[in-house]
């Protein structure tokens, strides 16, 4: 059992895409709210456990005006509000934090993932694995029927 830990909450915006990143909290029970009057679509949050035993979560959404989006988190009967991160317009890949509610955060850097996974390849792999599973199941069934026939006839 761990001590209760208050989460750190960040909003990351890129065009119409918004991500609410919630880091290092315990216990797992949490409610993440992305608030905007111009919502296009919103996804359920994904929660993972870190090696330290604390939890991290992210909630994604698409909004007409990403600047109108705020993120608030309810954890342990307390509400935590976000710190905004906006992409700089210069040539570096660093992210510049925008200070809100007297919260100061050090500069963070975001790096794009090196491996790009295409949806078509993932779907094809899933179908291939499903096909192999079906072939295996048929093989086991035929083997069972032939074995049963041998013993009972």
From Swiss-Prot:
Region (Disordered): 85-112
SUPFAM superfamilies, per database record: Immunoglobulin
Superkingdom: Eukaryota
UniProt biased composition (Basic and acidic residues): 85-102
A cellular-component GO term for this protein: gamma-delta T cell receptor complex
Biological process annotations from GO: adaptive immune response; gamma-delta T cell activation; T cell receptor signaling pathway
Protein source organism: Homo sapiens
Pfam families given in the database record: C1-set
Keyword Protein transport annotated: no
Quaternary organization: Gamma-delta TR is a heterodimer composed of a gamma and delta chain; disulfide-linked. The gamma-delta TR is associated with the transmembrane signaling CD3 coreceptor proteins following the stoichiometry: a single gamma-delta TR heterodimer associates with one CD3D-CD3E heterodimer, one CD3G-CD3E heterodimer and one CD247 homodimer forming a stable octameric structure. Upon activation, gamma-delta TR complex associates with FCER1G to initiate intracellular signaling.
Membrane-spanning residues: 130-152
Major location category of this protein: membrane
Protein name: T cell receptor delta constant
Record gene name: TRDC
Job description of the protein: Constant region of T cell receptor (TR) delta chain that participates in the antigen recognition. Gamma-delta TRs recognize a variety of self and foreign non-peptide antigens frequently expressed at the epithelial boundaries between the host and external environment, including endogenous lipids presented by MH-like protein CD1D and phosphoantigens presented by butyrophilin-like molecule BTN3A1. Upon antigen recognition induces rapid, innate-like immune responses involved in pathogen clearance and tissue repair.
Keywords linked to the UniProt accession: Adaptive immunity, Cell membrane, Disulfide bond, Glycoprotein, Immunity, Membrane, Receptor, T cell receptor, Transmembrane, Transmembrane helix
């Amino acid at each position: 059992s761990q001590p209760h830990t208050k989460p750190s909450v960040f909003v990351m915006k890129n065009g119409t895409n918004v991500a609410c990143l919630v880091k290092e909290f315990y216990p797992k029970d949490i409610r993440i709210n992305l608030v905007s009057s111009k919502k296009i679509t919103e996804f359920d949050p994904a929660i993972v456990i870190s090696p330290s035993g604390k939890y991290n979560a992210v909630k994604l959404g698409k909004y007409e005006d990403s600047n109108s989006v705020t993120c608030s988190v309810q954890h342990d009967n307390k509400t935590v509000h976000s710190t905004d991160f906006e992409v700089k317009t210069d040539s570096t890949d660093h992210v510049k934090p925008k200070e809100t509610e007297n919260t100061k955060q050090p500069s963070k850097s975001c790096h794009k993932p090196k491996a790009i996974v295409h949806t078509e390849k993932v779907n094809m792999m899933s179908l291939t694995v499903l096909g192999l599973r079906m072939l295996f199941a048929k093989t086991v069934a035929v083997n069972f029927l032939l074995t049963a026939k041998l013993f009972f006839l």
